[in-house]
């Protein structure tokens, strides 16, 4: 099992602004696919069903929603 720390924050000029931030955590299986992981993260944060740009790099996930000026960062907890 893997625990993910998730941060949702606003953007300003395309960069994370941290004017406000919401933090979550979720636990997933070790062998979860990238698609299933992104769906889980979006579901936990309340952004499921909204299209965004996703970048997955091993133990880091970034999901950007340019229309909403929001970004989600997810990191594996060590």
Predicted regions and their residues:
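Generic structural motif
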Residues: 9-11, 29-31, 68
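A short, exposed loop/beta-hairpin motif centered on an aromatic-Gly-Thr core
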Residues: 18-32
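General helical secondary-structure elements
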Residues: 19, 35-38, 47-49, 60
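Short aromatic-glycine-(Arg/Gly/Cys) micro-motifs in beta-strand/loop hairpins
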Residues: 1-21
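Hydrophobic beta-strand residues in large extracellular and virion-surface proteins
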Residues: 4-6, 37, 41, 63
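Short, mixed-charge low-complexity intrinsically disordered segments
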Residues: 44-78
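Generic low-polarity alpha-helical segments
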Residues: 14-15, 25, 61-63
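Polar, enzyme-active/binding microenvironments
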Residues: 29-32, 38, 43-44, 73-76
């Amino acid at each position: 099992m893997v625990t993910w720390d998730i941060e949702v924050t606003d953007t300003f000029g395309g960069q994370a602004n941290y004017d406000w931030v919401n933090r979550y955590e979720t636990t997933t299986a070790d062998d979860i696919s990238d698609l299933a992981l992104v769906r889980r993260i979006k579901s936990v944060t309340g952004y499921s069903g909204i299209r965004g740009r996703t970048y997955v790099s091993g133990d880091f996930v970034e999901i950007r929603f340019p229309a909403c000026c929001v970004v989600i960062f997810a990191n594996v907890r060590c």
